Amino acid sequence: PWQKGIDDPDCIATRDAMVDVIRFWLEHGCDGFRVDMAASLVKKDDPDKSGTSHVWKYIFDRVRRDYPEAAFVAEWSNPPQAADAGFDMDFYLNEKGNGYSTLLRDYGNHKDEDHSFFKKNAKGDVTSFVEEFQKYYDKTKGRTYISLLTCNHDTIRAKETLDDEEIKIAFATIFTMPGVPFLYYGDEIGMRYEHLRTKEGGYFRTGSRTPMQWTAGKNLGFSEGCADSLYLPVDPSDDAPT
C-alpha cells in the first residue's frame, strides 16, 4: 500500500526526470550508461519483471529518439529480461549457484573447498555454466549482448585463489565467448584482493575496491596526496603489480 502504481502521475514525473538526466549527459558527450540494480525499479514486481521492463521501455523510447547509438549496460544478471526491457548488454554476474560462479569462484565461504573450473586439480565442472550460458544466448541472440566480466566491485578478485596461468586461461575464455566482455580495472596487471576492514558497507567487497596501481611511485601512481588521505590503501607489498 505504500507504493504508488507505476503509471501514477508522480511516478511518470520521476521517469521523465530520469530521461532528462540521461539526455543531459549524452548531450555532453557520454556514450551511454551502466545501470546499477537495473532490475529493481519496481518493488514486489512479478517474476518476469514486467513493471520494471515497462519503466525502462518508457525511458528508452524517449532517449533513443535522439540518441539511437547510446549504449546501455544493465546490472540485471538475466539477459533475456534485460533484453525485453531494452538494454544493449547485461552483466552475467557472479551469483551463488549460477553457472558463472562455477568458473572462477566456486568456493563459497571455504576456499579450501574450491571447485572452480579454472583452478587446476579442483575437479570443477563447467556443465552448469555451459547450459545456462547457452540458454541465455539462445534467448538473446540478435537482441542484446551477454557481458561476462573478470570481476567487479562486488566480487573478490580472481587473483585471490587462481595463479597467473589459471587467470590467463580464464580471462582468455571470457574474452573469446560471444558477447561483450568487461575487464575490471587492475585485473589486467594482476591486482590483488586486499584483506581490509569493511568501509561504508563494503564488507568483503572492500578488498576489491582499492585504488588503481598505475606506477611504482608514490601511492602507486594513484595520488600525490598523503597515504592516509586515500579512501582505501594501495597494495603495500614490495612486489605490488603496476
Regions found by a protein language model. Name each.
Residues R64, N78, G86, D112, ...:
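Loop/helix patches that line or flank the sugar-binding groove of alpha-linked glycan CAZymes
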Residues M18, W25, V35-D36, F72, ...:
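Conserved, mostly hydrophobic/aromatic
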Residues P1-H28, D46-P47, W56-I59, R65, ...:
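Substrate-binding/active-site clefts of carbohydrate-active enzymes
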Residues C30, A38, G179-V180:
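A structural motif
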Residues P1-D16, A39-S53, D112-V126, D154-D163:
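The substrate-binding groove and active-site-proximal loops of carbohydrate-active enzymes
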Residues A38-S40, E75-P79:
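Active-site beta-loop-alpha junctions enriched in small/polar residues
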Residues D46-S53, A82-S101, R197-T215:
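Aromatic- and acidic-residue-enriched segments that line the glycan-binding/catalytic groove
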Residues I22-R23, S53-D61, V130-Q134, F171:
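Generic structural signal for well-ordered alpha-helices
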